[in-house]
Structure formats: C-alpha cells, structure tokens
Amino acid sequence: MLAGGRCAEPASYHLTESITRHGITADRMKTGTPVRIDARSVHFEHMEIQEGENDFHRFSFISEPRKLKQLSCWTCFTNEESHEILRNGLSDSPLYNGQIQSIGPRYCPSIETKIVTFPDKPQHQLFLEPEGESTNELYLNGFSSSLPMDIQIAALKKIPAFKDLVIYRPGYAIEYDYFDPTQLKHTLETKAIKNLFMAGQVNGTTGYEEAGGQGIIAGINAHINCHGGEPFVLGRDEAYIGVLIDDLVTKGVDEPY
C-alpha cells in the first residue's frame, strides 16, 4: 500500500489533521477503479458493440444543438477460467486480506466482491468504454480490482476479447478520509469553522453528479458569505440536490451516499 493524493499528486498528510483539531470528526471510506486498456490490443470481434445515443433531450427547448461526437462502447463477459485465477489471488487483495477494511460503494462492487458474493454466477458483464476521442485508452467498467497487476492481466487474458491484452494502468483500490456531514449546515458550511465549505467525496458521497451538486451549493454560499447576503438553500420539495444535502446534514452516512 502506498500513500497518494489525486492522480499524479502527493498525499495531503496533514490536511485532515488541520481540520480535526477544530473538533470536526473524520473517518475512512474506500473506492476502487478498474484497469485501463490499450484499444489496439483488443479483439473487438469477440465483443458486442453498444452505440451511443443520438436522440438528445435537454431541459430547455432553446438549447444549442449538441456537437459532441458520440463514441461506441463494447460489452463482453468474464468466464469460469478468469474467475478461478481471481479466486486464487484473493489472499493478495487488500480488500480481502485485511489491509483495507473501510466501507465502499454498495452498487459498485469490485470483481473480487462479485465472485465471492455470487459464487454461483458463471460470468459477469464488462463494459469497455473509451476515455476520449483522441486516445487509445479504454476503461473496463465492471472490473474494479485491488488484486496485483499480474493477476488482473492473467484473468483478463482468459477472456477471448483480451487474449492479447496490453494495459496502461491496472485497477487499484483507494482508502480516503471523509468528514461526518452532520457537522455541516444546509449551506455546506462547517458549523465549527466559519467560511469553510465542504463538497463532494469529502462529505461521504460517491458519484460525479452528487459532487457537482454539492459544489454548486457550496460555491454559491461561499460567494454569498463574502458579500453578506442571505443563505441559498434548496428544500427537499424543490430539487434532488435539496434531498441529497438534507439527507447528509440530518442523517449522516455509514456508507458512500
């Protein structure tokens, strides 16, 4: 296990400590990410293509037409041979050998968790997703893992589409700090430290939309604080963001929200 921050950044060792010394409590959660694959090594003839949608619906009828090119994804399945390799490597998985004991997102299980929780399932679906228009890097959704790189590669090579697999980066697990969100106001300002706002994963949530929604509210209220205006709070009856934030600050979390 290695200490680290965001991609290609060092760990922020003392950031949590600088906040908890003011009485704010912190805990740990975990998440994971899958292997990144070189598209030039994939046998797409052994996969099923999934075309992107071109029928776009927006909230406004006067929006500009969407110009972003849609890219296709592909699907395939694991098999018993790949499961056997994964099972044999479980003792080297931090998620199963005791190195990582935090709670992770319920609906994004690792491939290790899938084969342990559902031993009767002969296969699990995988989604191969492009990382962008101008890269050969593909994201293998459904194969989040903390197993050693050689085990991940060996298991994937048992799948026909990946028999000549070349990867950019293996999957890995992450354990991170978060702060109990009941210590926040509905504006996402901390109760203990005036003018300190928190948004996203640090509040115990998981997901891009959840983080983005909190960021909007925290940013608006930080601006309002600077200019002495009235707090901006969305109610449960007004927006999904209102439901999200009310859940966080009144109920707290015991797993990634």
Predicted feature descriptions by range:
Residues 19, 210-214, 247:
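Acidic helix/loop or adjacent segment enriched in Glu/Asp that either coordinates divalent metal
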Residues 195-224:
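Conserved mid-domain beta->alpha element of the FAD-binding
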Residues 139-205, 232-246:
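A glycine-rich dinucleotide-binding beta-alpha-beta segment and adjacent secondary-structure elements
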Residues 216, 222, 228-257:
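Non-catalytic terminal regions with compositionally biased, polar/charged low complexity
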Residues 5-13, 145, 212-213, 234-238:
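Short, conserved loop/turn and helix-capping segments at secondary-structure boundaries
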Residues 17-153, 241, 250-257:
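An anion/pyrophosphate-binding glycine-rich loop and adjacent beta-alpha core
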Residues 29, 96-104, 162-170, 229-234:
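Flexible, glycine/charged-enriched surface loops at secondary-structure junctions
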Residues 1-38, 159-160, 164, 217-230:
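Glycine-rich loop(s) and the adjacent beta-strand/alpha-helix scaffold that form part
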